[in-house]
């Protein structure tokens, strides 16, 4: 990634962001307009914390110590656009419901699964899914299920390792290589793994640049 692209994120991420909508089912989705970047991952993988760190607003996406708290598709956009006509934001960030919470009621899990699958299959403006993996645990069985779902939906996705401050720094390159090996033959996987720590602000600049490149926004 070039130095120019790595520093071009400021016009987009250097402004306030706002929450615009929680979507419990497909009929509540906003009209298709700006490109969408979605964040998926297991419960408590750090999705909300990562979104807050990306935009520099601690309270934007609600964080919780209770797994499975996010039960909707939560939409966030940069402030300063009317949302009407051509005055649309360049993109929207979407915080998806976490998966893999064993104590969640089955009907809730079924509803989340349907919402996520329908969204992945039927949203033309969805540009990429960033699948968050806890660096302490690596890719687990239900992560593999989501990878398969994304492959079947032909939805481009990229792996983002979270909480790298919780493991030894020397182990991060090895974990990246192990993760790359696991996704090497998956058709929809973007062949580059990002590593981040929301708490230590590690890897955020690279993730911002990757997102800007994905949506074609370079200032």
UniProtKB/Swiss-Prot annotation:
<dbReference type="Pfam" id="PF01926">
    <property type="entry name" value="MMR_HSR1"/>
</dbReference>
<comment type="similarity">
    <text>Belongs to the TRAFAC class TrmE-Era-EngA-EngB-Septin-like GTPase superfamily. EngB GTPase family.</text>
</comment>
<keyword id="KW-0132">Cell division</keyword>
<keyword id="KW-0479">Metal-binding</keyword>
<comment type="function">
    <text>Necessary for normal cell division and for the maintenance of normal septation.</text>
</comment>
<keyword id="KW-0547">Nucleotide-binding</keyword>
<dbReference type="GO" id="GO:0005525">
    <property type="term" value="F:GTP binding"/>
</dbReference>
<keyword id="KW-0342">GTP-binding</keyword>
<keyword id="KW-0131">Cell cycle</keyword>
<feature type="binding site">
    <location>
        <begin position="41"/>
        <end position="48"/>
    </location>
    <ligand>
        <name>GTP</name>
    </ligand>
</feature>
<dbReference type="InterPro" id="IPR030393">
    <property type="entry name" value="G_ENGB_dom"/>
</dbReference>
<dbReference type="InterPro" id="IPR006073">
    <property type="entry name" value="GTP-bd"/>
</dbReference>
<dbReference type="GO" id="GO:0000917">
    <property type="term" value="P:division septum assembly"/>
</dbReference>
<protein>
    <recommendedName>
        <fullName>Probable GTP-binding protein EngB</fullName>
    </recommendedName>
</protein>
<dbReference type="InterPro" id="IPR019987">
    <property type="entry name" value="GTP-bd_ribosome_bio_YsxC"/>
</dbReference>
<feature type="binding site">
    <location>
        <begin position="68"/>
        <end position="72"/>
    </location>
    <ligand>
        <name>GTP</name>
    </ligand>
</feature>
<dbReference type="InterPro" id="IPR027417">
    <property type="entry name" value="P-loop_NTPase"/>
</dbReference>
<dbReference type="GO" id="GO:0046872">
    <property type="term" value="F:metal ion binding"/>
</dbReference>
<feature type="binding site">
    <location>
        <position position="70"/>
    </location>
    <ligand>
        <name>Mg(2+)</name>
    </ligand>
</feature>
<feature type="binding site">
    <location>
        <begin position="162"/>
        <end position="165"/>
    </location>
    <ligand>
        <name>GTP</name>
    </ligand>
</feature>
<keyword id="KW-0717">Septation</keyword>
<feature type="binding site">
    <location>
        <begin position="95"/>
        <end position="98"/>
    </location>
    <ligand>
        <name>GTP</name>
    </ligand>
</feature>
<dbReference type="GO" id="GO:0005829">
    <property type="term" value="C:cytosol"/>
</dbReference>
<feature type="domain" description="EngB-type G">
    <location>
        <begin position="33"/>
        <end position="217"/>
    </location>
</feature>
<feature type="binding site">
    <location>
        <begin position="196"/>
        <end position="198"/>
    </location>
    <ligand>
        <name>GTP</name>
    </ligand>
</feature>
<feature type="binding site">
    <location>
        <position position="48"/>
    </location>
    <ligand>
        <name>Mg(2+)</name>
    </ligand>
</feature>
<keyword id="KW-0460">Magnesium</keyword>
């Amino acid at each position: 990634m070039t130095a120019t692209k790595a520093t071009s994120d400021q016009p987009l991420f250097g402004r306030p962001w706002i929450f615009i909508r929680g979507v419990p089912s497909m009929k509540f989705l906003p009209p298709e307009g700006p490109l969408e970047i979605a964040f998926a991952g297991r419960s408590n993988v750090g999705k909300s914390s990562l979104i807050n760190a990306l935009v520099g607003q601690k309270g934007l996406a609600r964080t919780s110590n209770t797994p499975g708290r996010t039960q909707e598709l939560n939409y966030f956009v940069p402030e300063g656009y009317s949302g009407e006509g051509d005055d649309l934001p360049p993109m929207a960030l979407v915080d998806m419901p976490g998966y893999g919470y064993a104590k969640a009621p089955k009907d809730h899990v079924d509803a989340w699964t349907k919402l996520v699958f329908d969204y992945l299959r039927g949203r033309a403006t969805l540009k990429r899914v960033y699948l968050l993996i806890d660096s302490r645990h690596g890719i687990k069985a239900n992560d593999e299920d989501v990878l398969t779902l994304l492959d079947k939906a032909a939805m481009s996705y990229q792996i983002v390792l979270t909480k790298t401050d919780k493991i030894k720094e020397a182990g991060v390159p090895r974990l990246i290589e192990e993760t790359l090996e696991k996704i090497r033959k998956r058709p929809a996987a973007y062949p580059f793994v990002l590593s981040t720590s929301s708490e230590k602000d590690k890897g955020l600049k690279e993730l911002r640049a990757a997102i800007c490149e994905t949506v074609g926004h370079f200032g």
